[in-house]
């Protein structure tokens, strides 16, 4: 009887494991989310697994043995409770497949009003307030210098959120 199971994949090999399992006629589910991150100094939307290194698979252990699944490239092991692989309820799989996250952001990405610290340049060590992005690779920060607030454009790689 077909059931859903949870696999733990080797680091960075989730996609490889999914491809090889799908070639063996195994249904796979790896829920993804889209995050807005600063990558190489530019603000971009990045698609990442909701559960890094975990892959939900549906198969019949009497047709495809668990050792075959376990020996697939990229797979580390089954998530188990005791000696046997844990069965994931179909209701959980259904909820994961229809789940559409809203406005998920990387906690390290600053937004207007967030406090940041400048890590490089002439104002290194100064605290500032993030006001707005200034193109793809820079941002406008509000610095308080001698009781006067000054807007200053800084590279996205030269500050971090507090």
Swiss-Prot record:
GO cellular component, as recorded: cytosol
Pfam families listed in its UniProt record: NusG
GO biological process: DNA-templated transcription elongation; positive regulation of translation; transcription antitermination; transcription elongation-coupled chromatin remodeling
SUPFAM superfamilies to which the protein is assigned, alphabetical: N-utilization substance G protein NusG, N-terminal domain
Domain remark from Swiss-Prot or TrEMBL: The N-terminal domain contains a vast hydrophobic cavity that is buried by the C-terminal domain. This cavity may bind the RNAP and become unmasked only upon binding to the nontemplate DNA strand.
Family matches, as HAMAP family: RfaH
Annotated NCBIfam families: PRK09014.1, RfaH
Role of this protein: Enhances distal genes transcription elongation in a specialized subset of operons that encode extracytoplasmic components. RfaH is recruited into a multi-component RNA polymerase complex by the ops element, which is a short conserved DNA sequence located downstream of the main promoter of these operons. Once bound, RfaH suppresses pausing and inhibits Rho-dependent and intrinsic termination at a subset of sites. Termination signals are bypassed, which allows complete synthesis of long RNA chains.
Protein name per its UniProtKB record: Transcription antitermination protein RfaH
Provenance organism: Escherichia coli (strain K12)
């Amino acid at each position: 009887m077909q059931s859903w199971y949870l696999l733990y994949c080797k680091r960075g090999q989730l996609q490889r494991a999914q491809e090889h399992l799908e070639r063996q006629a195994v249904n796979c589910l790896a829920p993804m989310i889209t995050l807005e991150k600063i990558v190489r100094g530019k603000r971009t939307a990045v698609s990442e697994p909701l559960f890094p290194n975990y892959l939900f698979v549906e198969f019949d252990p009497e047709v495809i043995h668990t050792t075959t699944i376990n020996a697939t490239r990229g797979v580390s092991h089954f998530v188990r409770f005791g000696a046997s692989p844990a069965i994931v309820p179909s209701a959980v799989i259904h909820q994961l497949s229809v789940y559409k996250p809203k406005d998920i952001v990387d906690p390290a990405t600053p937004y207007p009003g967030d406090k940041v610290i400048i890590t490089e340049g002439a104002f290194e060590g100064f605290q500032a307030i993030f006001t707005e992005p200034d193109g793809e690779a820079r941002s406008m920060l509000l610095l308080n210098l001698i009781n006067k607030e000054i807007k200053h454009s800084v590279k996205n790689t030269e500050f971090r959120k507090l």
